[in-house]
């Protein structure tokens, strides 16, 4: 757990505040079964680099959130590749893990080859707790589709869980962002009917919603609750493309800190990458579906 003393003395003036809880969010690495993403990006290595950057900065997260699209093509080998680096990070930091699958994931294969569980179908909805903080992951993936949905049973289960507040509040994780996007492409593949989720979390102890999917950093609100959309570790989407989806090498991960007084700060941590275009497709392009 983060430094609950909340501050440390400095020679420059007021004490520096320390977080009570730290969450690191890695999203959309799109790890292939072998080789490189788009033939150029070592997506697996970028997850490794993210972990090493945390360690080098002295960041020891309480929770590691993987917010979907862990595999690029839903292959078992991708999860097998990822598992050692994720398990090593959990041991290294003493962190808990929460996974919210994305549209590129196969939930049954993810359960078996990343989490070491039985190959069950159906949504992967989970709850993790650290101290008085509750982190809920809800699975918005729809088999063979790009957009996200939450069914009635999931929303009912979420409402039941939220009926009893957690001492330090709740962070909700869902792969598909429940907020508007600046590009039509991202809007088309976002979470459908976000107002239904808004109705469930309104007035509850949910203090932050974490998402991924769009490969860009953005923020908004849902039912008055802040929403943070994390970047991809594998690529960075161009927010100024009016009619398609263009990605550059780059990306990063997110660090979310919760302080003793309840303040929450989300920070984008960039990974270095060459400024090259990885793909550039339009809404009517036959190559569109494989990349979103």
Language model features by range: what are they?
Residues 50-63, 147-228, 254-255, 262-264, ...:
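His/acidic metal-ligating clusters that form di-metal
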Residues 15-24, 127-137, 163-171, 222-227, ...:
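Beta-strand-turn-beta hairpins that frame and shape the catalytic cleft
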Residues 3-8, 226, 231-292:
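Metal-dependent phosphoesterase/phosphodiesterase active-site architecture
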Residues 32-35, 72-75, 81, 103-111, ...:
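Active-site environment of divalent metal-dependent phosphoester hydrolases
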Residues 1-81, 181:
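N-terminal active-site segment of His-dependent metallophosphoesterases
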Residues 27-48, 72-74, 106-121, 144-152, ...:
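Acidic/histidine-rich helix-loop elements
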Residues 76-160, 164, 196-202, 223, ...:
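Extended active-site neighborhood of metal-dependent phosphoesterases/phosphodiesterases
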